Amino acid sequence: MNQIKCIFFDLGWTLLEPCSGDWNLNQKFYELFPREKISRLDQNVWQHAYNTAYLPFIENPKMTSEQEQIERFTRFYLTLFDQAKLEGTFQHAVKLAVDMVENLATMNLIPSSLETLKTLKDGGYRIGIISDTWPFIERRIHAFKLDEYVDQYTYSYELGVLKPDVHMFQNALEKSGFKPEECIFVDAQLRNLKAAESMGIHPVQIVYHEGVETGDYPTIQKPSDILNLLKQYQ
């Protein structure tokens, strides 16, 4: 008898990937500030600027609307311009923030994502999402047809906490109605998998993205690999 009844997936680098390679710096950003220009900056200064601009999202992940996301990411870009000494304007910041929210072409489904979810759904599994993300994700979930297969969603911007905070996993478990040992969580980040494991959820690491630190958890290279891995839990 299969002990697994529910599979939770992260979104970023698990089912979705950013076309530019960065979730917050999309193609339009690199049209304004080419990669060659960014690469010529002192990388310590650049990283400090990026981290400083992003810090408010870590300190307060709660968000209520796409409009709030646009406003907050406008401030993100303005801070980044200032800290990195980039010649960006307020108008640039607004355009980048609006593009982040409204342009569906800033991210793609990772190959085999949709087919894997369909196979799991047809196999009787409950499917959930546990993701650190922002309100713009709703229109992408629909555009990529993930909502045809996903039963439940746990988003950081709704709860006001980020993984590895255990409240993210508690919320997902409560929505699922299943015991932790009946669930798998697929994510790229070890710290998130450790948190899930501490709750009794089976962790599986996806290493689709280059440079991911790996550990001792079961691993998959792409979403469809979960189908074979599930046989180990039967």
Q: What does each model-found stretch correspond to?
A:
Residues 65, 104-105, 126, 157, ...:
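A generic structural signal for short
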Residues 82, 123-125, 201, 215-216:
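Short glycine/proline-enriched coil/turn segments at helix->beta-strand junctions
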Residues 19, 125-126:
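Short, compositionally biased strand/turn segments
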Residues 32, 36, 116-125:
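A short, Lys/Arg-enriched amphipathic alpha-helix followed by its capping loop at the start of a domain
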Residues 2-111:
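N-terminal helical cap/lid subdomain that shapes the substrate entry/recognition surface
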Residues 1-7, 17, 91, 114, ...:
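Asp-based, Mg2+/Mn2+-dependent phosphohydrolase catalytic module
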